[in-house]
Amino acid sequence: ACNAERSAISTRTLLQLAALSRQHFEAMQERVQGDWDFSTTGKLVLYPTQAGVDAARHQLDVQSKLGSAPQRIVTAAEAVALEPALAAYQPQFAGAVHTPSECAADCYKVSQQLEAWLRQQGVKFVMGTKVQSLRREGGSNGKIVAVQTSQGDITADHFMVALGVDSVALCKPLGVNVPVYPLKGYSLTLDVSQAGNKAPSVSITDSSRKVVFARIGERLRVAGMVELVGHDLSIPKDKIQSLCASTEAVFPGCSDFAEVQPWAGLRPATPTAVPIAEKAGASNRWLNTGHGALGFTLAFGTA
């Protein structure tokens, strides 16, 4: 998964999936007409050294040949012109990659409003129910006939397993190996409604701090870190303090951090970074998992 040839294949696949996902997301927006703090203000990836900028330029050349969205290298001064909230941080980075087409939205609101719309179309959602196992008929490749749940069996013609890292445990008793591992990450959400030009409107990735900042309406979402800790979802205080410190360093004065909404999640990662969207063993069982940190980016392309 890590050699140059395999990496190029994975990059091409991810770029194609991302483009397809964007198309389907835009089509969904036209149909659902929701309000989920959607914005298309672009993204800047900051690099602390000129060597980092040069390496990014090489990667852009590779991605361009594979069909990526338009991107360009900008100087630190040009980055500040695009996002004035970076002015105080300008001495800390040498340049950046600018992707004008990048968008942001509140994934939770998207999910809520898409669910409401689907209910109107006649889709049934079963909430508050624990999925226990998949019941099949015949041998190892036998068809799945039901999902066994805490509320009884649910039968269907086809079954899609889209449980993130929990897809592994559900499929294991059926002899299906799902190569997904949880990579733990943290985020916090801040109210920046009174921040003025101290808070960014452009999405920012600071490659030196390994932290991303996304403006979602009047809030700023700050996320980062990768930990290999199994399925632990605890939120140690020092992790959130670290994200707060990074926020104050990059965007001083954008928040008083009086109300911080912390969160921890498990990114379902595959060895190649490419999600798994395919049949799994039985003719009527499908997998849709392994999106890693690109869940929103790829979701509509793998649905």
List each model region and its residues.
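Active-site substrate-recognition segment that forms the wall
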Residues: 1, 87, 131-136, 140-144, ...
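Dinucleotide-binding Rossmann-like beta1-alpha1 core, especially the glycine-rich loop
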Residues: 1-76
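Short beta-strand to alpha-helix junction loop
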Residues: 9-22, 47-55, 96-116, 234-242
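Surface-exposed helix-capping loop/turn segments at secondary-structure junctions
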Residues: 27-38, 68, 121-124, 176, ...
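Helical element adjacent to the flavin cofactor pocket in flavoenzyme catalytic cores
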Residues: 54-66, 86-158
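General small-molecule cofactor/ligand-binding pocket signal
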Residues: 72-74, 124-126, 260
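Short, conserved active-site loop motifs that form the nucleotide-linked donor/cofactor pocket
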Residues: 122-124, 220, 285
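A conserved FAD-binding loop/helix module that cradles the flavin
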Residues: 231-237, 286-302
